[in-house]
Amino acid sequence: MRSLPLLLLLLLSVTLPSGSVIADACIISSRAKGVEVELCQENRSIPRELFRSGYCQPQLVDQQVAVRFVASCPNGAFGICRNAQAANLAYRQDVHYYGVASDARFLRPACEQQPGARWESPQR
């Protein structure tokens, strides 16, 4: 009998009234001069509203940008910066990189310079 209220509470905590899942990640796609970039930011400790309205809304000059909110980042990333520090604050996120795997030679060192962050190269 007690498990039903707990189940309902769990369901209410992860769904919106419309039935859609609360997003904990955002996929950002950008294009400039024929170059396409796609990454996914997965929230670890950023306040939800700040994550959605700030971190997932990049202001990139002369680029077409599309943002999609998802429950979690999809598989297929060539690299993931785990526990990345967000904007020199205590906030943390995991950043998944898709596209050109050779970009890891720049992204990995930048990731590893952040305190507590670590680079992962998932099996593709």
Sequence positions of predicted segments:
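Mitochondrial intermembrane space
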Residues: S20-R124
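N-terminal secretory signal peptides that target proteins for export/translocation
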Residues: M1-R2
